[in-house]
């Protein structure tokens, strides 16, 4: 199937996306998103990533901006259609398989992050690899391979072996992403949407919540 998400995934909008377990949302609404090295951590946080890769990222240095390591930042992708989301659905890559209903997608906007003077960096490939380039200026957003993101195409290509890593370019927000910088939540089903809206209502918070089952893998 051919996709074209160029209207929403582009350097002008600079939307950034993070997937989390649905049951982490109440804590996130109360505390925002905290980096791996933060002293503020949820007691019952449900991790959905690859534990081995999470461990490796802890000591990986960030060579620009505020510096530190990858665990000093809250990571986002520039697409909601990540290989990680597919691996969670399929159970590949050392990741626990989970139904789509358990996963929600948070959306923010890197231009809004910058406007609020929250420190950030971003990369043109998966942040863990040594050949990845890091940037601190929004003027460098054109270094991201937007066409493959817009086409939702992360198939490995023997003629372009770095394509898979470029698809996983990251936006990294220093230490803490407050809830005020989140623009909305995407979920798989109407049942989950109603639950998310209830959690927002209980906290007198207003945020867009949309059901987009077609954004998930099946």
From Swiss-Prot:
Give the InterPro entries listed for this entry: DarT
Binding residue positions for NAD(+): 18-20, 57
Task: List the active-site residues.
Answer: 57, 170
Q: What is the effect of changing residue 49 to D?
A: Decreased levels of ssDNA ADP-ribosylation, decreased viability of E.coli without endogenous darTG operon, impedes DNA replication, induces RecA expression. Still ADP-ribosylates gDNA in vivo
Q: Which reaction does it catalyse?
A: a thymidine in DNA + NAD(+) = an N-(ADP-alpha-D-ribosyl)-thymidine in DNA + nicotinamide + H(+)
EC annotation from Swiss-Prot or TrEMBL: 2.4.2.-
Q: Enumerate the GO terms in the molecular function aspect.
A: DNA binding; glycosyltransferase activity; nucleotidyltransferase activity
Give any Pfam family that matches: DarT
* This protein's record includes keyword Lipid metabolism: no
Q: Where is this region: NAD(+)-binding element?
A: 41-59
Q: Which residue stretches belong to region ADP-ribosylating turn-turn loop? A: 123-170
User: Domain DarT, which positions?
Assistant: 14-217
Which UniProt keywords are given for this protein, alphabetically ordered? DNA-binding, Glycosyltransferase, Nucleotidyltransferase, Toxin-antitoxin system, Transferase
Q: Which family does it belong to?
A: Belongs to the DarT ADP-ribosyltransferase family.
Q: What does this protein do?
A: Toxic component of the hybrid type II/IV toxin-antitoxin (TA) system DarTG, which plays a crucial role in controlling bacterial growth and bacteriophage infection. ADP-ribosylates ssDNA in the sequence TTT/TCT. In case of phage infection, DarT toxin ADP-ribosylates DNA, which inhibits both viral DNA and RNA synthesis and leads to abortive infection. Its toxic effect is neutralized by cognate antitoxin DarG. May target ssDNA loops during DNA replication, probably modifies thymidine.
Assembly: Interacts with cognate antitoxin DarG (via C-terminus); this heterodimeric complex neutralizes the toxic effect of DarT by preventing ssDNA binding to DarT and consequently inactivating the toxin by direct protein-protein interactions.
What's written under domain?
A: The NAD(+)-binding element stabilizes the ADP-ribosylating turn-turn (ARTT) loop which confers substrate specificity; both domains contribute to ssDNA-binding.
Protein name as annotated: DNA ADP-ribosyl transferase
Write down the species. Escherichia coli O127:H6 (strain E2348/69 / EPEC)
């Amino acid at each position: 199937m051919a996709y074209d998400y160029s209207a929403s995934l582009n350097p002008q909008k600079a939307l950034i996306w993070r997937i989390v377990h649905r049951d982490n949302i109440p804590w996130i609404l109360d505390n925002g998103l905290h980096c791996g090295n933060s002293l503020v951590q949820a007691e019952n946080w449900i991790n959905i990533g690859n534990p081995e890769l999470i461990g490796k990222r802890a000591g990986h240095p960030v060579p620009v901006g505020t510096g530190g390591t990858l665990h000093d930042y809250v990571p986002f992708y520039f697409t909601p259609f990540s290989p990680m989301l597919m691996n969670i659905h399929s159970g590949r890559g050392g990741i626990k398989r989970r139904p789509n209903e358990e996963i929600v997608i948070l959306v923010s906007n890197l231009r809004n992050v910058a406007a609020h003077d929250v420190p950030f960096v971003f990369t043109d490939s998966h942040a863990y690899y040594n050949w990845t380039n890091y940037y601190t200026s929004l003027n460098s957003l054109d270094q991201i391979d937007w066409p493959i993101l817009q086409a939702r195409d992360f198939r490995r290509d023997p003629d372009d072996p770095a394509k898979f890593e470029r698809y996983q370019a990251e936006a990294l927000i220093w230490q803490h992403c407050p809830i005020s910088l989140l623009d909305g939540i995407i979920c798989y089903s109407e049942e989950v949407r109603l639950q998310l809206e209830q959690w927002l209502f209980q906290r007198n918070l207003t945020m867009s919540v949309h059901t987009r089952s077609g954004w998930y893998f099946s």
